[in-house]
Swiss-Prot record:
Residues 1-256, 268-301, 338-423, 469-505, 674-699, 736-770, 924-949, 1038-1132 are annotated as: Disordered. Interacts with CTNNB1, AXIN1, LRP6, KEAP1, APC and BTRC. Interacts with SCF (SKP1-CUL1-F-box protein) E3 ubiquitin-protein ligase complexes containing BTRC and/or FBXW11. Identified in the beta-catenin destruction complex containing CTNNB1, APC, AXIN1 and AXIN2. Interacts with WT1. Residues 121-133 have a biased composition (Low complexity). GO terms for cellular component: cytoplasm; nuclear body; plasma membrane. It comes from the Eukaryota. Residues 24-35, 195-208, 218-229, 281-290 have a biased composition (Basic and acidic residues). The gene is Amer1. Residues 372-423, 756-765, 931-941 have a biased composition (Acidic residues). Regulator of the canonical Wnt signaling pathway. Acts by specifically binding phosphatidylinositol 4,5-bisphosphate (PtdIns(4,5)P2), translocating to the cell membrane and interacting with key regulators of the canonical Wnt signaling pathway, such as components of the beta-catenin destruction complex. Acts both as a positive and negative regulator of the Wnt signaling pathway, depending on the context: acts as a positive regulator by promoting LRP6 phosphorylation. Expressed in kidney. GO terms for molecular function: beta-catenin binding; beta-catenin destruction complex binding; phosphatidylinositol-4,5-bisphosphate binding. Keywords: Acetylation, Cell membrane, Cytoplasm, Lipid-binding, Membrane, Nucleus, Wnt signaling pathway. This is APC membrane recruitment protein 1.
Length: 1132
């Protein structure tokens, strides 16, 4: 009765844990009677109605029974802070004392029967106290519940004798809503918890290590003992499942329905009898028993309490909220029932479900106050309990005898069942630990191996964290979380005393070693602190961001290898906070891994791009190198081929054959080419150079002619040499290729040698770039072979008119006066005494001296040994190696050469001289002339690139005229006749200045209109780089008959030469047409080509009439040469 009164006081809020202990002591006197009544209480159908009321009232004790588990976790103080010690007393009073007394008798019996059962009985007797005291901490409360079940089962026999349960129980449940809920939840949750437990055991069966909590074994043994007792009591033994279920329901409804539910479920689902485990556990149990007793005396040192506090601190945090607020006490207890059930069942799903329920209820904090027990209900409960206790005292004696017998039977059955189930329980406990295996974690847990050598770890928080005080395990945020989450909003704004004030004084748990839960505000999720620095080594750690070092090589390994989980003891189950932290860590870890992989992939892509770019660059460079190499090889091959061709040309070119003429003993003979002199050139002109088998010009020998043929011909004999040269058949050999500048001027003029310093002499002249025509004539004459006699020259095969393709570039033929009868194509030339005209002509020549494009490849080697330049003749006549083009348009008249300034006397004296020029051109030349006249204007724009004058001019200093041998040519008012003897007489240096004996027998290029442009486009009348030969005017008849081509040729006749009767009368002077030679381009009128045969004539010295009147009477054309002003009659 005292115990009932104490319970009533506690229900009102004034009782303490000591009261509960006193109550437990009384109950210990009543021992099994009390527990026997408990059995039917949870399941009224199984128990009598009279016992139920008393048992329920005694067990529940008003609020005492409900607060058994919460009181330990801080819920014992449900409505007042003065209930500090109620937790301890509640846990201890019922279970410990009752079990200890009840187990005394069975202990002896067991000792007598078997040796193995002796420690079991002791453990069952003493251990439930330790279990209730320390084991209350454990949420996997199978152990405690089974202990209480043992007591309950002890009184199962007396179930029928209980007659008051319905009234008291009915009033109790009607007044106390939470008891009914607790009972229902406990009974309902027992089954799913059992299922989950069974699944967990099944899964983790292989992985469970032998190490387990000693308290669990002992509690399980006690549980089986208690279960075995009630089985026999009702008469028909209930199956173990029923037995377990009934005590579970009892306990769930009474004290901790959740624990009982879990225990019953675990036993109900897996009643595996494992005798081996039981036998092994017995010595351990005895040792544990001592430790448990020590735990009662000195709770802080109780290893079971420490372990449970570490394992299930999160639930403590939940209950602390209830106990602190007082409002949510009932809700928290109910929630804790579900939590403990889920924890006991061991399923993570159940754990989560319980957590969710608790979370929902926690947010309900303020509203749960209406569910608190009123004082009236507590008073009613006290009265009922007193009545029940009286009845129990009467029945205790009867029950004791029956219980002893039941205990003996149960001990045997229980050990079989317990051993198997205990192993399963241990397997489950370790299954959660195996889910998060600890590899090498120095957590400081000091394991105490029991004598059974199964390696059960006894965890001591003081030893586990030797370097930390009990208060250092929680962060400030976590400390606030314990006391703070008591406001309706769930925030930490309350100053209610913290949980550490009175949470675990009796059990020595002044400070919990587990992190408390927050109020789902999420504020403290990332502020956890663990003494083992496991968070620092977690994947989100700085040193683990991109250096995962194989510990978590696989993406899913971190789930199985998270250090925050390993910080818990082996049997612990993860709390919600730990799970959230784990999830957060995993998210962070995966995010970092993803970023790492993205960075690696980006680096790989970048490296690949660089490699591709390098490959492309290398490919392009190699391709460029190959292309350049191929080009270089091609160029080398081309140059090699050119060199080979040049070598071949040089090899094929025959050696020069020298023919010594009798008149010139040292005259150098020219090559007597196989092609006869009678061969007619296709261009109407013949080559004056020795014929060679190669048509390519040879300009490579740059030595002066005099040096090349030193000693062969003296200056004294130059005239003789020239005569021999003219008499030579090869001198004017009609070779078309030679006419196209195939030969070198040195061949034609071998004795020519420019002075050593000709440029200084020329610099003194103002007409540096041009040479006076008289000077050119004299120089040409001195450099050419004059015929010894007209007969000899006529007998020779040379056709002078056609055989001068390469004359030295010389004078500017600026014809100032051109009169054409009836044609009108050339304007009348005004008087050539205008200084402006002279200036214009001089400026025109200054525009350019030579055509750069054409001379670039030839000027270097052309002018080195042959310093002659083109001044007045067209570009297509004067440039070597260039195919002839149509002549440009007629230049303006009134052009004078600068050489006039140096030869004014010549201009005065020779102004009246007439040019007797008969030009009978072949049909091809006539057609060319006609086309050139008509197309001259058009062609000028085509190929006059720089300037029309630049095509004919040449750089200054190229006229290095040597002091040629001079031929004495008398000049007078009458006809000037040159006797052959005069050709050999030397004359004064000054004589050649005034020597205007004859117009050089140059075949001017004339295109006769009336022909198609293609007839004689490439016909060349005369090369421009050879000097005009000086001498008497010849009628150089081409030897057409010898070449098989009888075509009209050019005829140069004296103005008044009646002796030239060999020319047919048809070619009379009356038919002569004026020819205008503008800038070296003769402009002939349309000549009617009357067919005739030119007979070979004796070329006699022409009569040059220097008088103007006579020239006007006898000549139809007055041609004024700017440099020599020579007028003559053109005779056809």
């Amino acid at each position: 009765m005292e115990s009932q009164q104490d319970e009533a006081v506690q229900t009102k809020g004034a009782s303490t844990s000591s009261d509960a202990q006193d109550q437990g002591a009384e109950k210990g006197a009543k021992n099994k009677t009390t527990e026997a009544t408990e059995g039917p209480t949870s399941e009224p159908p199984l128990s009598g109605p009279g016992r139920l009321k008393k048992t329920a009232m005694k067990l529940f004790g008003g609020k005492k029974g409900i607060c058994t588990l919460p009181s330990f976790f801080g819920g014992g103080r449900s409505k007042g802070s003065g209930k500090v010690s109620s937790k301890k007393s509640l846990n201890k009073s019922k279970t410990h004392d009752g079990l200890s007394e009840a187990s005394q008798g069975p202990e002896d019996v067991v000792i007598e029967e078997t040796d193995l059962s002796t420690p079991l009985s002791k453990s069952s007797a003493q251990f439930p106290s330790s279990q209730s005291a320390n084991g209350a901490l454990e949420i996997g409360s199978k152990h405690k519940t089974s202990g209480t079940e043992a007591i309950e089962k002890a009184g199962v026999e007396k179930v029928p004798s209980v007659h008051k349960p319905k009234k008291s129980l009915k009033s109790f449940f009607s007044s106390i809503r939470r008891h009914r809920k607790g009972k229902t939840s406990g009974a309902d949750q027992s089954v799913p918890g059992a299922k989950e437990l069974e699944g967990a055991r099944t899964r983790s069966h292989e992985h469970v290590s032998s190490i387990s909590l000693p308290s669990s074994e002992e509690i399980f043994r006690d549980t089986r003992k208690e279960n075995a007792k009630p089985q026999d009591a009702p008469g028909p033994k209930m199956s173990p499942a029923q037995v377990h279920f009934s005590p579970t329901t009892e306990k769930a409804a009474c004290k901790n329905p959740e624990k009982l539910t879990r225990t019953c479920a675990s036993e109900f689902m897996q009643p595996k009898p494992v005798l081996e485990g039981g036998s092994l556990e017995e010595p351990h149990t005895s040792e544990t028993e001592g430790k448990v007793v020590a735990g009662e005396v000195n709770p802080p040192n109780g290893p079971v309490g420490d372990q449970l506090s570490l394992l299930f601190g999160d639930v403590t945090s939940l209950k602390s909220f209830d106990s602190l607020t007082g409002c949510g006490d009932i809700i928290a207890e109910q929630d804790m029932d579900s939590m403990t059930d889920s924890m006991a069942s061991g399923g993570q799903r159940a754990n989560r479900d319980g957590t969710k329920r608790s979370s929902c209820l926690v947010t309900y904090q303020g509203g749960g106050e209406e569910m608190a027990l009123p004082d009236d209900d507590d008073n009613d409960d006290e009265e009922e309990e007193e009545e029940e206790e009286e009845e129990e005292e009467e029945e205790e004696e009867e029950e004791e005898e029956e219980e002893e017998e039941e205990e003996e039977e149960l001990l045997e059955d229980e050990e079989e069942v317990k051993d198997g189930e205990e192993n399963d329980d241990l397997e489950y406990l370790w299954a959660s630990a195996q889910i998060y295996p600890r590899f090498n974690m120095n957590l400081g847990y000091h394991t105490a191996i029991s004598p059974s050598h199964q390696g059960y770890m006894l965890l001591d928080p003081v030893q586990s964290y030797p370097n930390l005080g009990l208060g250092e395990l929680l962060t400030p945020q976590s400390d606030q979380q314990e006391s703070a989450p008591n406001s309706d909003e769930g925030y930490y704004d309350s100053t209610t005393p913290g949980f550490e004030d009175d949470s675990g004084e009796a059990l020595g748990l002044a400070h919990r070693d587990c992190l408390p839960r927050d109020s789902y505000s999420g504020d403290a999720l990332y502020e956890f602190y663990e003494p083992d620095d496991s968070l620092e080594h977690s994947p989100p750690g700085d040193d683990c961001l991109y250096d995962l070092r194989g510990r978590n090589s696989e993406m899913l390994d971190p789930f199985l290898n998270l250090e925050p989980f390993s910080s818990r003891p082996p049997g612990a189950m993860e709390t919600e906070e730990e799970r959230l932290v784990t999830i957060q860590k995993q998210l962070l870890y995966w995010e970092l891994r993803r970023e790492q992989r993205e960075a690696q992939e980006a680096c790989a892509r970048e490296a690949h791009a660089r490699e591709a770019y390098a490959r492309d660059t290398h490919t392009r460079e190699s391709y460029g190198r190959n292309v350049r190499a191929r080009e270089t090889q091609a160029l080398e091959a081309h140059s090699q081929e050119g060199r080979v061709q040049e070598t071949k040309v040089r090899q094929e070119k025959p050696a020069l054959e020298y023919q010594m003429r009798p008149l010139g003993p040292s005259v150098m003979g020219l090559v007597a080419g196989t092609s006869g002199g009678s061969q007619t050139s296709h261009r109407g002109t013949t080559s004056a150079f020795p014929a060679t088998s190669s048509s390519e010009p040879d300009w490579r020998d740059f030595r002066p002619l005099e040096k090349r043929f030193e000693g062969t011909c003296s200056k004294k004999d130059q005239s003789t040499c020239l005569m021999q040269l003219f008499q030579s058949d090869a001198m004017f050999e009609p070779d078309m290729q030679e006419a196209n500048f195939g030969g070198s001027p040195r061949k034609a003029y071998p004795s020519y040698s420019p002075p050593e310093e000709p440029e200084e002499e020329e610099e003194e002249k103002e007409g540096n770039a041009t040479v006076s025509f008289s000077q050119a004539l004299v120089e040409f004459t001195s450099n050419g072979n004059l015929f010894t006699s007209m007969s000899y020259s006529s007998d020779s095969d040379s056709s002078f008119t056609q055989n001068l393709p390469e004359l030295p570039p010389m004078v500017t033929f600026d014809i100032a006066d051109v009169e054409r009868d009836g044609e009108g194509k050339c304007e009348e030339n005004p008087e050539f005494n205008n200084d402006e005209d002279l200036t214009a002509s001089l400026e025109a020549f200054e525009l350019g001296y030579y055509h750069k494009h054409a001379f670039n490849s030839y000027h270097s080697r052309f002018y080195q040994g042959l310093p002659w330049g083109v001044s007045s003749l067209p570009r297509y006549l004067g440039l070597p190696g260039v195919h002839p083009r149509p002549p440009p348009a007629a230049m303006a008249l009134n052009r004078r050469s600068r050489s006039l300034d140096n030869a004014e006397s010549l201009e005065l004296e020779l102004s009246s001289s007439h040019l007797a020029q008969g030009y009978m051109e072949s049909d091809e030349l006539q057609a060319h002339q006609e086309d050139s006249d008509e197309e001259g204007e058009e062609e000028e724009g085509e190929w006059g690139r720089d300037s029309p004058l630049s095509l004919y001019t040449e750089p200054p200093g190229v006229y290095d005229w040597p002091p040629w041998a001079h031929c004495p040519l008398p000049v007078g008012p009458g006809l000037a006749w040159m006797s052959p003897n005069q050709l050999y007489e030397p004359f004064n240096q000054s004589s050649y200045v005034q020597a205007t004996c004859c117009v050089p027998p140059v075949a001017m290029p004339v295109s006769v209109p009336g022909r198609t442009p293609g007839d004689s486009v490439s016909q060349l009348a005369r090369p421009s780089h050879l000097p005009l030969p000086m001498g008497p005017c010849y009628n150089l008849q081409s030897q057409a008959s010898q070449s098989g081509r009888a075509k009209p040729r050019d005829v140069l006749l004296p103005v008044d030469e009646p002796s030239c009767s060999s020319i047919s009368g048809a070619n009379s002077q009356s038919q002569a047409k004026p020819v205008g030679i503008t800038h070296g381009i003769p402009q002939l009128p349309r000549v009617r080509p009357e067919p005739f045969q030119l007979q070979p004539n004796h070329y006699r010295a022409s009569n040059l009439d220097l008088s103007k009147e006579r020239g006007e009477q006898g000549a139809s054309l007055s041609t004024s040469y700017s440099s020599t002003a020579m007028n003559g009659n053109l005779a056809k």
